[in-house]
Amino acid sequence: TLNINKMPAYAPFARPLYVMLKPASSLCNLNCEYCYYTEKSDMYRAQGAGSRMTLSDELLEKFTRQYIEAQTQPQVLFSWHGGEPLMRPISFYEKALRLQRQYARGHMIDNCLQTNGTLLTDEWCEFFRRNNFLIGISIDGPKEFHDEYRRTRGGGPSFDKVMRGIRLLNKHGVEWNAMAVVNDFNA
């Protein structure tokens, strides 16, 4: 068997291994026109996939243990993406943090999460601050650019909800950055 702990620290294992986790699969509360996950999410729903669309507790534990064990560097980054990762409850991420501590074995664990920001609440922001998450907010520029493609499931604009989420992050002192999709309308 391959034991990476006994391997010399050179390529290909000398660099950190990064993986994006999709705890809610393609589930999302928005219906962005350019998003390829929306179609996949609708397909899964039509097939009655239900709970198979989300990361199970069993798979979360297995992945966490194996991901940390595979690291040859002291720092491990868990990068939570979607769909919309806030479609999972805070209790899911509390369990993830417990598992990270359980399997850390001296590694420094960091967490970042990419969200559309519309589901942020005081409770989420307090959780992120307490646990030192870096939050990425998906926002495509000013209101008129953002709302062109980033629409709610009902077809309405989402910019004001994203800005409300950003204000909550600031209120709670949560570190955040922005990610924009450059497209034909905002370029």
Predicted segments, located by residue:
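Radical SAM/AdoMet-radical enzyme domain recognition
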Residues: L60, T64-S79, R88-A187
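Flexible, glycine- and charge-enriched loops at secondary-structure boundaries
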Residues: L21, A49-D57, L86, T152-F159
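Canonical Radical SAM [4Fe-4S] cluster-binding loop centered on the CxxxCxxC motif
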Residues: Y18-S56
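Short acidic donor-binding/metal-coordinating loop in glycosyltransferase active sites
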Residues: G82-G83
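Short secondary-structure boundary micro-motifs
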Residues: N3-Y10, R52-T54, K62, D110
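N-terminal [4Fe-4S]-dependent radical SAM core
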Residues: T1-K22
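A generic fold-level signal
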Residues: F13-A14, L27, Q73, R130
